[in-house]
Amino acid sequence: MTDLRHYDVIVSPSITEKSTLVSEQNQVVFNVAKTASKPEIKAAVEALFGVKVTAVNTLIRKGKTRRFRGFAGKLKDVKKAVVTLAEGQSIDVSTGL
């Protein structure tokens, strides 16, 4: 049985033009929790999807400044993880968890 903490680490798949391009190199992009470490992300992906992960790269996308009714606000920062899968394995992110 999967640990419920794995669902707290992986927030959602990131479906963008760039993420569909890197899927050809056997990589998948996820939005992850801000406090998640690379070993936690690797363990969560392997447990939830049943695949072998070879590498995890992370980045933090800074939130943009937005104006609403004359007041400046800021969108939240988002942490993303680019997960490289072992050769011959894949994840269909459109089906969900």
Swiss-Prot record:
GO biological process: translation
Pfam family, one: Ribosomal_L23
One cellular component (GO) term of this entry: ribonucleoprotein complex
Keywords, alphabetical: Ribonucleoprotein, Ribosomal protein, RNA-binding, rRNA-binding
Spans traversing the lipid bilayer: none
A GO term, aspect molecular function: structural constituent of ribosome
Subunit structure and binding partners: Part of the 50S ribosomal subunit. Contacts protein L29, and trigger factor when it is bound to the ribosome.
Function as written in the Swiss-Prot or TrEMBL entry: One of the early assembly proteins it binds 23S rRNA. One of the proteins that surrounds the polypeptide exit tunnel on the outside of the ribosome. Forms the main docking site for trigger factor binding to the ribosome.
HAMAP family: Ribosomal_uL23_B
The name this protein goes by in its record: Large ribosomal subunit protein uL23
Lineage start: Bacteria, Pseudomonadati, Pseudomonadota, Alphaproteobacteria, Hyphomicrobiales
Gene: rplW
